[in-house]
């Protein structure tokens, strides 16, 4: 209930149903205006804004209203009335009514905030916003996002509860296990020289819960990774962690697809059709990404076979390299791109390791069947290195038409995929080529392993992912092994990923062997899991959604920092609390830790 000693209703919830009633509201002064001897106060709370009118007929209230300033906390008692015709505000829930003040009480005064809270267009540095995050979160946009997140999380819980899942907490203090990023370590006071690790995910514990017989588990879990930050990464983040037993890949995907459909319908009244499916190989071939944005109708076309014999080493080299790739990206209407725009895209792909960006402008493709007019039909510095047959085949394969442009990537396949995949996304957004607002997708059949630069195998997901095929097939051809893994992609962002897990000791040992993990190392790091696999582990699998990332997409924020109450900066620091910080010598001594003077000196120097 809203009613309390202080208020009868939230400011943003006062509606026409309360007209002629006397009510009390509390909140912050969002804006104060003085018009012709009448004072208007915009009162703000988490539910929205209410316009309050204070006139001289109530002299005591008027005097207080004259003295209040933005961000004062006040209580107002008054009569709800209809706004005068022409003064309504359709953008506010309370936009057809106002509160005529009778009594005003100042509950707390406020200094002038370090940045305006009533101007969403104000440009304020993120560091300043995070330093005063408790003020930043008063802004209506931030209030709306935090409320949205809370309600979306509640919708997730309801769906999983209704589908028989149990909310089980797993430990925060655990042991270090390699999962692809650095662990945050916590020294043990009772066992000097030993350390806990904060979990990068509840992966092993949720698998143990399956062994324990809790066949449907979920948790809104805090996870920690000490890694370099990007727009969609934080050192501590929240994931919706899910695990099931006795369900196959398709059944797990259907449950989780249903979850996302439920959340979008509940929160945004958006209804999705069945999510399309695409294999990893198809995604990399057509989109050069394992998380393609299907809102953008552009595809890469492999043209290496056409370039093997051209007199252009930039193309011929990768075309004849088993690890190379030559791919074309046709942009309909792209011939209108200026030299300046093309130069900007060339600079963009260099970020991803590309050494240039070749292109052909198709000014006129009308007579392509009669040969290529290199004078007026095509425009590019590279066409002089190609025969007419190659150019005709190139135009036909890409489907290029008049006024198109074709961009090329030619290098190691990994470089082409990174550079041209990113270029596809950027051009699609720059030229407003998106065909829909939301494009969900499942990507399946990932490789089990990927090769490192030094020739070793590493898990593409994690070492507990179940491969397709038998133990013998895995041992014989690890390079071609596929995993029973699946990622959920939304608008080019991976929002969730999961797999079936290994539930036999024989297969888990074979995977460890492929990864170069010997018996002793496996026992030291994962002995408790290997023991559990000896006692009847059921077939199981699951998935985890990045809650921060999902909410970021749903509310249209540019960073997950905008949907987390108290996030860290890009350098994993908290401007509000000044964390991380030094601790006193007594605390360090109790933990058996001594900070080297050189480290302290380096830290002091870098802070100057």
UniProtKB/Swiss-Prot annotation:
Pfam families: GAD, tRNA-synt_2, tRNA_anti-codon
Function: Aspartyl-tRNA synthetase with relaxed tRNA specificity since it is able to aspartylate not only its cognate tRNA(Asp) but also tRNA(Asn). Reaction proceeds in two steps: L-aspartate is first activated by ATP to form Asp-AMP and then transferred to the acceptor end of tRNA(Asp/Asn).
GO molecular function: aspartate-tRNA ligase activity; aspartate-tRNA(Asn) ligase activity; ATP binding; nucleic acid binding
Catalysed transformations (reactions): tRNA(Asx) + L-aspartate + ATP = L-aspartyl-tRNA(Asx) + AMP + diphosphate
GO CC annotation, single: cytoplasm
Residues annotated to bind ATP: 225-227, 234, 494, 546-549
One Gene Ontology biological process: aspartyl-tRNA aminoacylation
Domain of life: Bacteria
Spans annotated as Aspartate: 203-206
HAMAP family: Asp_tRNA_synth_type1 (MF_00044)
Site (Important for tRNA non-discrimination): residue numbering on this chain: 35, 86
Natural source organism: Psychrobacter cryohalolentis (strain ATCC BAA-1226 / DSM 17306 / VKM B-2378 / K5)
Annotated binding of L-aspartate, by residue: 179, 225, 461, 501
Protein name: Aspartate--tRNA(Asp/Asn) ligase
Keyword line: Aminoacyl-tRNA synthetase, ATP-binding, Cytoplasm, Ligase, Nucleotide-binding, Protein biosynthesis
């Amino acid at each position: 209930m809203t009613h309390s000693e202080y208020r009868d209703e939230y400011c943003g919830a006062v509606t026409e149903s309360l007209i002629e009633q006397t009510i009390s509201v509390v909140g912050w002064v969002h804006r104060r205006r003085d018009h012709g001897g009448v004072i208007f106060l915009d009162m703000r709370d988490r539910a929205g804004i209410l316009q309050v009118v204070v006139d001289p007929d109530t002299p005591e209230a008027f005097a207080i209203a004259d003295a209040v300033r933005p961000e004062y906390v006040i209580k107002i008692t008054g009569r709800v009335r209809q706004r005068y015709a022409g003064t309504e505000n359709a953008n506010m829930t309370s936009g057809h009514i106002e509160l005529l003040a009778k009594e005003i009480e100042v509950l707390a005064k406020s200094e002038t905030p370090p940045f305006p809270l009533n101007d969403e267009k104000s440009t304020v540095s993120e560091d300043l916003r995070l330093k005063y995050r408790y003020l930043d979160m008063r802004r209506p946009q931030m209030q709306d996002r935090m409320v949205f997140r809370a309600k979306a999380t509640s919708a997730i819980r309801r769906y999983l509860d209704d589908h028989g899942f149990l909310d089980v907490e797993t430990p925060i203090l655990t042991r270090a296990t390699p999962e692809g990023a650095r662990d945050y370590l916590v020294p043990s006071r009772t066992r000097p020289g030993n350390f806990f690790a904060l979990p990068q995910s509840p992966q092993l514990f949720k698998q143990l819960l399956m062994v324990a017989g809790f066949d449907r588990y979920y948790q809104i879990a805090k996870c920690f990774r000490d890694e370099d930050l990007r727009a969609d990464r934080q050192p501590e983040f929240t994931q919706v962690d899910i695990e099931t037993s006795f369900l196959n890949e398709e059944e797990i995907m259907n449950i989780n697809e249903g979850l996302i459909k439920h959340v979008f319908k509940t929160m945004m009244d958006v209804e999705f059709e069945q999510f399309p499916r695409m294999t990893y190989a198809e995604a990399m071939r057509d989109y050069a990404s394992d998380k393609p944005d299907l809102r953008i109708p552009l595809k890469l076309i492999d043209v290496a076979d056409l370039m093997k014999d051209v007199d252009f080493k930039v193309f011929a080299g990768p075309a004849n390299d088993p690890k190379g790739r030559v791919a074309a990206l046709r942009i309909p209407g792209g011939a209108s791109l200026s030299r300046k725009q093309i130069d900007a895209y060339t600079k963009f792909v260099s970020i991803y390791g590309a050494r240039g960006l070749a292109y052909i402008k198709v000014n006129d493709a009308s007579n392509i069947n009669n040969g290529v007019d290199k004078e007026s039909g095509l425009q590019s510095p590279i066409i002089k290195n190609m025969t007419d047959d190659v150019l005709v085949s190139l135009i036909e394969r890409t489907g290029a038409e008049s006024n198109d442009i074709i961009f090329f990537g030619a290098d190691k396949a990994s470089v082409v995929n990174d550079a041209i995949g990113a270029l596809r996304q950027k051009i699609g957004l720059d030229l407003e080529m998106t065909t829909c607002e939301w494009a969900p997708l499942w990507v399946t059949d990932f490789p089990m392993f990927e090769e490192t630069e030094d020739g070793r195998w590493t898990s593409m997901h994690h070492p507990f992912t179940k491969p397709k095929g038998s133990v013998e097939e895995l041992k014989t051809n690890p390079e071609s092994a596929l995993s029973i893994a699946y990622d959920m992609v939304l608008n080019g962002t991976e929002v969730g990923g999961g797999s079936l897990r290994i539930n036999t000791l024989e297969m888990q040992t074979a995977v460890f062997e492929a990864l170069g993990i010997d018996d002793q190392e496996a026992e030291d790091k994962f002995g408790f899991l290997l023991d559990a696999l000896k006692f009847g582990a059921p077939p199981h699998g699951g998935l985890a959604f990045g809650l921060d990332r999902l909410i970021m997409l749903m509310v249209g924020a540019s960073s997950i920092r905008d949907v987390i109450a108290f996030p860290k900066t890009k350098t994993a620091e908290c401007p509000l609390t000044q964390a991380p910080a030094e601790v006193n010598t007594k605390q360090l001594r109790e933990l058996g830790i001594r900070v080297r003077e050189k480290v302290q000196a380096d830290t002091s120097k870098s802070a100057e």
